[in-house]
Curated annotation (Swiss-Prot):
EC number(s) from the headed UniProt entry: 3.4.21.-
The protein's name in its UniProt record: Serine protease HtrA-like
An annotated Gene Ontology molecular function: serine-type endopeptidase activity
Entry keywords, A to Z: Cell membrane, Hydrolase, Membrane, Protease, Serine protease, Transmembrane, Transmembrane helix
A Pfam family reported for this protein in Swiss-Prot or TrEMBL: PDZ_2
Gene Ontology CC: plasma membrane
Compositional bias annotation for Basic residues: 1-20
Domain of life according to the entry: Bacteria
Enzyme's top EC category: hydrolase
Membrane topology of the entry: Single-pass membrane protein
Species of the source: Staphylococcus aureus (strain MSSA476)
Compositional bias per record (Basic and acidic residues), positions renumbered to this chain: 21-64, 71-108, 138-186, 264-296, 310-330, 348-364
Single biological process term from Gene Ontology: proteolysis
Length: 769
């Protein structure tokens, strides 16, 4: 933006400075109106509600003239400061440290002055030194405007002013500006009021008013000299300006880490300076008012009047004033709070000063200071590190804040979760243990029951031996098979024992050797035997209390697959009390038995099948169920190659019927119809034609002989009759015919037979008694 007098600044800076200028003007106008109103109320002023700038030139033109004047003044200051910039780094550092601590002292002094009754003290002070103040009004014009701007926006403007004012060559001027930036709006009000009182002198009033206008014209240029130093550059585009702002912002973030290592050494230098200036403080006390600001509302003065440069004497005087303020601050208060904040502000001032110097060097074709560049690089690296630390700190702060807000709920939630996990684990363990215990209990119960049944059954099972082995007249094979077997004590009456066993075990001998589980032996007598049922009853006497009577079960309730135990004496006494386990493999089996060992079956035995291991010597042994009750007596097994675990037992209900008759009668009376028969399956073709047997008949028996006056003869059976059904049941062979007839031994009722005679079918009734 061209503002005349060969000055060009970026448009964005121009707009920003214009807004600040107009804002300050409006603020000053409102402030003056307010002060005038108060003066009217106090009868100290004859002016009321005077509107400032109404008759002045256009605001925009006034702003341009003010800005142009400031730029010219700034260029002169920059040229003067070039010579001083060649000083050594050590001098610059010492100047910075002195400025830093002086600035800190001024700020602390200002804080202490706020607690004093400023209205009375400052009014008196201003009256005594009004002449000194008026003599230095040209120097204080710009400073008065800066004070008012800094009071409205203290942090922003203060940092920008200190950016340039903290240069080593201008430390005195920086001290004055920093002192003024620390003053509050209340100080400005009191000073303005005092000046209003002094304005009663007619010969001085017009001059004071003209100086206020000069202050207003220099307000904006003085606010941010660091920005004005760049105005001689070429106009920056908006992206370049934003990039520059970001770099400056990053440099400000690392301000507190740049000069941290040198603060301890600077403190000693500051103390030396303080002791050096202490003697001269009292001599220059009357010159304090030269630093005050003068406010007036006269718009008729020249707006374009530039600020006057400060002399060396003024700079020395400013330094002495600040040393005095530091001394008073230390005397009034021992508080040290704010040191770090002032140090940080000083760091920012020095940082902006270095940036301004580098920018100025670039504009004039000079290389930046090597130390400043190194510091900038160090700042950038430190900035990155600080950003990472700041991010981690932010996360930590968020977590801490979250924990502080919600820690009771989190603790309760964690407790509930832990409680649920513990209860779940407990319940799972309990359930698991219960299941294991149930399984163990079931297994233990099963095991215990099985063992209990086995132990009880062993006490009721005995070994039966006959004297057949001593009889040399019998075949050796027969003697070896019949010489040993097992028996079951099914009844005990006092010392009398009733033992059931197989008929083929006792053989033809009346006396049997009975050996108990405790290896005691007695001689028993055979009460009776029945070869058709293969059962025998032996009576023995023993006072041994260990021999028990076995419990009797019910064979009519047998279930296929029901578990059973077989207790016997396989292979004789040496293996007595052997227990084997199995299940019921089949029910209602008709097993052909050869009693006399002539390789011809003599009888069909009704039995149930088991798969428990049965060996020679188990004949006559006990078959018990899971309750330990007797359900059968072992009778036979199939001994064939490739056949295993196919054994048969007589149902206990049939055994009870047989042993009852054997106890009382010693034998079983079966019906005898008085016939001899042949199986149809064994007839040849000539024999089939002789009896005129139809071709469809495959099974049955042929009557070969009929006894005279026998039951068959009385019933009308004749030789050559073919019987195919008996008692409503198919007749396969003569074994089946005998089994059906013997099954009616108790009732001896007549049964119906279906026969073929001379090729014709007919039925007859066969009498059984």
């Amino acid at each position: 933006m061209d503002i005349g007098k060969k000055h060009v600044i970026p448009k964005s800076q121009y707009r920003r400075k214009r807004r600040e200028f107009f804002h300050n003007e409006d603020r000053e106008e409102n402030l003056n109106q307010h002060q005038d109103k108060q003066n009217i109320d106090n009868t100290t002023s004859k002016k009321a509600d005077k509107q400032i700038h109404k008759d002045s030139i256009d605001k925009h033109e006034r702003f341009k003239n003010s800005l142009s004047s400031h730029l010219e003044q700034r260029n002169r200051d920059v040229n003067e400061n070039k010579a001083e910039e060649s000083k050594s780094n050590q001098d610059s550092k010492s100047a910075y440290n002195r400025d830093h601590y002086l600035t800190d002292d001024v700020s602390k002094k200002q804080n202490s002055l706020d607690s004093v009754d400023q209205d009375t003290e400052k009014s008196k002070y201003y009256e005594q030194n009004s002449e000194a103040t008026l003599s230095t009004k040209s120097t204080d014009k710009v400073e008065s405007t800066d004070m008012r701007k800094l009071s409205s926006d203290k942090n922003k403007v203060g940092h920008e002013e200190q950016h340039v004012l903290s240069k080593p060559s201008e430390h005195d001027k920086e001290t004055r500006i920093d002192f003024e930036s620390s003053r509050t709006d209340s100080d400005s009000s009191m000073q303005t009021e005092k000046i209003k009182k002094d304005s009663s002198d007619g010969n001085k009033s017009s001059n004071l008013k003209s100086e206020v206008i000069s202050d207003k014209s220099n307000t904006v240029p003085k606010l941010s000299e660091s920005d004005d130093e760049v105005n001689n550059q070429k106009p920056l585009t908006l992206p370049e300006e934003q990039k520059l702002k970001r770099q400056q912002s990053q440099n400000e973030q690392t301000k507190t880490y740049t000069y941290g290592d040198s603060e301890q050494n600077d403190k000693s230098n500051y103390e030396n300076d303080l002791s050096h200036h202490m003697p001269s403080i009292s001599d220059d006390k009357d010159n304090v008012m030269r630093e005050n600001h003068i406010v007036d509302d006269n718009p008729d003065n020249d707006i374009n009047t530039p600020s006057l440069s400060k002399t060396d004497d003024d700079r020395k005087l400013d330094e002495k004033i600040h040393v005095e303020d530091k001394h008073k601050q230390n005397a009034d208060s021992s508080e040290t709070v704010g040191y770090q904040s002032q140090s940080s502000a000083s760091h920012r001032i020095t940082e902006k000063r270095n940036n301004a110097i580098n920018d100025h060097d670039k504009l004039n074709g000079q290389k930046p200071n090597a130390k400043t560049s190194a510091n900038n690089n160090q700042k950038k690296a430190t900035s990155k590190l600080n950003k990472g630390r700041a991010t981690n700190n932010n996360y930590s702060d968020i977590l801490k804040k979250f924990w502080m807000m919600y820690w009771p709920k989190l603790v309760i939630l964690m407790g509930i979760i832990i409680l649920i996990v513990i209860l779940n684990a407990i319940f799972n363990n309990v359930n698991k243990n219960d299941r294991m215990n149930d399984n163990n209990d079931a297994d233990a119960q099963k095991y215990t029951t099985t063992m209990k049944n086995a132990n009880n059954t062993v006490k009721s099972v005995v070994t039966v031996e006959n004297e057949t082995s001593k009889d040399s007249s019998l075949p050796k094979d027969k003697a070896s098979q019949d010489e040993v077997g097992s028996g079951v004590v099914y009844k005990k009456s006092g010392d009398t024992l009733y033992i059931v066993t197989n008929a083929h075990v006792v053989g033809d001998k009346e006396n049997q050797k009975i050996t108990f589980s405790n290896n005691k032996s007695v001689v028993g007598k055979v009460l009776g035997k029945d070869k058709w049922s293969d059962l025998a009853v032996v009576k023995a006497t023993s006072s041994d209390s260990s021999v028990k009577e076995i419990a009797i079960g019910d064979s009519n309730n047998l279930v296929l697959g029901e578990p059973i135990l077989v207790v016997g004496n396989p292979l004789g006494v040496d293996f007595k009390g052997t227990v084997t386990e199995g299940i019921i493999s089949g029910l209602n089996r008709n097993v052909p038995i050869d009693f006399d060992k002539d390789n011809k079956y003599d009888m069909l035995m009704k039995a149930f099948q088991i798969d428990a291991s049965v060996n020679p010597g188990n004949s006559g042994g006990a078959v018990v169920n899971r309750e330990g009750k007797l359900i059968g007596v072992v009778a036979a097994k199939i001994s064939m190659p490739n056949v295993e675990n196919m054994s048969f037992a007589i149902p206990v209900n049939e055994v009870q019927k047989i042993v009852k008759d054997l106890e009382t009668k010693g034998k079983i009376d079966y019906p005898d119809v008085g016939v001899k028969m042949k199986n149809i399956a064994s007839l040849n073709s000539f024999e089939r034609q002789a009896v005129k047997l139809p071709g469809k008949v495959k099974n049955g028996v042929v009557v070969d002989q009929v006894d005279n006056n026998g039951l068959a003869d009385q019933s009308g059976l004749k030789k050559g009759d073919v019987i195919t059904e008996l008692d409503g049941k198919l007749l396969e062979d003569d074994l089946r015919f005998r089994q059906i007839i013997f099954s009616h031994k108790d009732d001896l009722k007549s049964i119906t037979a279906k026969i073929y005679r001379d090729g014709k079918e007919k039925e007859i009734n066969i009498k059984l008694k």
